[in-house]
């Protein structure tokens, strides 16, 4: 069995409680996407990824979020595009049987929102 353990860090929280994933303007942006794919039958890590996302200069990061994750604009400037990160995530996640994470419902929605925002179909089981 392949297990995906993933986490996101974002620019903040949604502007309203439980907005539609299609109201992307209500949602923050993903600035870090980290995940591990583990094969339980082989007892090995298939891949370990920690991508910082190079967001637009005018995209604000809330002070509260920055205090939690400590991600700086300089770190993001060295990052990859959200498109690259999502395509890579899709490639690895499509072979997984189980998804695990802390606050995984929020993280799943964040990935889906970024997919909607960037016109990329996200594969979630």
Language model segments and positions:
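Conserved non-catalytic scaffold segment of RNase H-like nuclease domains
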Residues: 1-117, 123-124
């Amino acid at each position: 069995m392949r297990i995906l353990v993933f986490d996101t860090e974002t620019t903040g929280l949604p502007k309203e409680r439980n907005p539609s994933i299609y109201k992307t303007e209500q949602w923050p942006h993903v600035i870090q996407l980290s995940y591990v794919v583990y094969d339980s039958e082989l007892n090995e890590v298939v891949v370990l990824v920690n991508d910082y996302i190079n967001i637009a200069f005018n995209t604000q990061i809330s002070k509260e979020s920055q205090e939690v994750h400590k991600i700086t604009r300089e770190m993001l400037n060295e990052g990859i595009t959200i498109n690259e990160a999502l395509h890579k995530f899709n490639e690895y996640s499509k072979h997984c049987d189980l998804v695990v994470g802390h606050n995984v419902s929020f993280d799943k929605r964040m990935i889906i929102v970024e997919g909607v925002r960037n016109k990329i179909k996200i594969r979630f089981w």
